[in-house]
């Protein structure tokens, strides 16, 4: 299958001279999007997972909550199906030096409760997300802004200034020309003034400014469904072509697949293992299987017995060599995954299969045994190597396959450790209560190599689930982010990966395709660069 690179459009096109964000239009829908006839009041349904946390943009960093936030809020920019950047709430984003940015907001925009979408709505939300005391999972995304600190609470970042109702400025600690490219991620979304009256209540019943809104108070029925309706007040480029979205929170993808077959679900955004060989014939002409900016990994925290220091590095390398990725992607996934060659994704600009050290991802049972024996010489292994995973997703098949390979190739006991739901799985991880290795992965927030590295492996980053820290790696990330030339930045990010290949804070497994299927009653179904279906453009026939 042809691989389409997602270029760092923002980085390549920022030069000195007060240029507006390249690739952003002042308004309107990108030409690549099509409108289709259908009942504008018809409600579509899609499967989803229970969000891990209350629905606050700066504290949502997983896919279940992310799909809801993305649907209910509008940021300064958004990404189309190919990952190109377009203005949404922003009228312009300008800079002379890639360090200080002036952001102007389109006038007359409101949240669904009538609060204005103004400069304060962004600055207050960003300050909250960045402050140490608030412990927001996405705080890392504000690290570049002047005044941010991991060591002390900073209620108001010195790099954020409100100029007037519709204008604010952002000053970074150093020039970072891809900064505007990040601004479509949920962490940078605005929040209404009313949210701060009772943030706990807001998390259960969020008020946004995007294409959709909660159908009513209490529309989030936990572990059952989240019902959204079209937000008629939203006038941006993502205007919904349907009457709303019912997000059904399934306990398993097999159940969701059965509902799609039975006509009780419109869009399925994940295919269960049991249907990988049949889904394209079951829904002929109504499926997607395409490369996307997502990957799968196993994280083995250094705090676990036998996985710290030199012993831990040797054991991670041994486990990586003991995994036959080709066999699993062919047999378990029926060719719908691609064995990993790096820590990012083939559709991200800068991807390379030739980074020194990447040979640790090659299957080599003899080398695996050798490395494991070297680790045993430091401290003999005992017990069972377990891999925690969420049972409500299609994970058991590949986890069992890896466990069997580790048994055969390392001579150890290995097994999966199922957790009922994705939300419970993530909570154990984020609260550092996971006592084993665990299934992990990354769905890119914005199309940049930095996003596949910094938020996951940078020291103190919000999605650094294994608490990895390496000063040399952090320095290379900073150098790459501040590089004036795109290619220079990519080289630094590739050098940073050399360190990851040596220490393996996570073990890359494979790249995840965007896979899904849909029913006969919906049209204009398209899955984006980030694996998500683009819900606002879906149309549905009248029932």
Regions picked out by a protein language model, each given a short descriptive name:
Residues 206, 233-278, 293:
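Ligand-site clamp/hinge motif
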Residues 47-97, 207:
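N-terminal lobe/hinge region of extracytoplasmic solute-binding protein
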